[in-house]
Amino acid sequence: MSPFDEELSQRLQALSEQGLRRELRRVDSAQGPRIKIGGKTFLNFSSNDYLGLANDPILKEAAIKAVEKFGASAGASRLICGSLAPFHELEETLADFKKTEAALTFSTGYAAAIGTICALLGKNDIIIIDKLVHASIVDAARLSGAKLRVFNHNDLNDLEKILQWADKNSKAESGKRKAEILIVTESIFSMDGDAAPLREIVRLKNKYGAWLMVDEAHATGIIGKNGRGLAEKLGVSDQVEIQMGTLGKALGASGGYICGSRVLVDFLVNRARSFIFSTAPVPAAAAAATAAIQFIQSKPGEARRNLLWKRIKQFSVKFQSAIIPILIGDETRTVEAATKLRGQNIFIPAIRYPTVARGTARLRVTLTAAHTDKEVSQLTDALKTLNA
């Protein structure tokens, strides 16, 4: 073994000893309530395909037509010759759906966060993030070079204290522009499933003259009128400067997006490096996402959304989303719990550090509209055995 591989092997061994080593599992089926892994079929309670659209005939037909007309790849970045019609159609559909002036799509939600935050902020600016925001937002905040402050999860008092500090430290210096203050939160948090107090955050951002960026990845398609998200449901979407999200969760496709003003989108086209220097996404995925947005605004889409909420309430009336965390704490015990569930043909992976903080390992249950009453009951019964 080379010195290089030997060093990495030692690091992997350390992860194993801490119960933190992960592995890829090959899935030999489409996403759905049942998936095939290692020749065995499991009930799947781990997918973000909340509305069961990833394998829906409507999306597959749209993707196939896009492949037939536009091929398998865009072949270049959007600013060269890769700005194919499906991307423009998707962005127009997204902007109309979110009731914003414009939208811009990225290859992933991660790329959307990195590109947007790093384009908007520099070393003289201030970024304030919720403690539990997605890793892409944390990484973007660090890469931007802006002064980073973190407020305790959904803690408005802590947020205001930081905003007071930021307000004092954002005054324009001689020859320099005023420092901007950007608050970033998720609307529905990816690992805990709880909701941000967006109305109150909007009040604070207006009070201190800050900008607000809201990641609606786990709310889009599920919450609000026609699934427009939590900001729309709470009546504050017009006061959110930057709406971010993904196309690979409830929408069943792939990619990330930013919705906002026309000026914002034009600025990102010129300054977001993850957009400028990436080959455009797959046109088939864009076409599928457009079909998904059109579907979720239809009567059948509303019925699908209502079915999801029926499944959530069947499991428990207290949850605010399709994400249900089963907190265990210890990493090794969490892995053992996931293994025990697989023995009952139920697939729920152990979520451990660095996805969540040390000592907060959990099983992250996700429910979808594709699950049946019987399957949710099977899940409930299986979870009871963990305490037996």
Residue ranges and their predicted role:
Residues 116-135:
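Conserved PLP-anchoring active-site segment centered on the Schiff-base-forming lysine
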Residues 149, 153-214:
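Active-site phosphate-binding strand-loop segment of PLP-dependent enzymes
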Residues 57, 61-65, 69, 96, ...:
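PLP-dependent enzyme catalytic core of the Aspartate aminotransferase-like
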Residues 244-246, 250-319:
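PLP-dependent aminotransferase class I/II
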Residues 304-345, 355, 359-360, 367-369:
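Conserved PLP-binding catalytic core of the aspartate aminotransferase-like
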Residues 8-10, 14-70, 210:
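N-terminal "arm"/small-domain region of PLP-dependent enzymes with the aminotransferase-like
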Residues 209, 229-247, 266-270:
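Conserved active-site segment immediately N-terminal to the catalytic lysine
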Residues 61, 65-109:
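Conserved N-terminal alpha-helix of the aminotransferase class I/II PLP-enzyme fold
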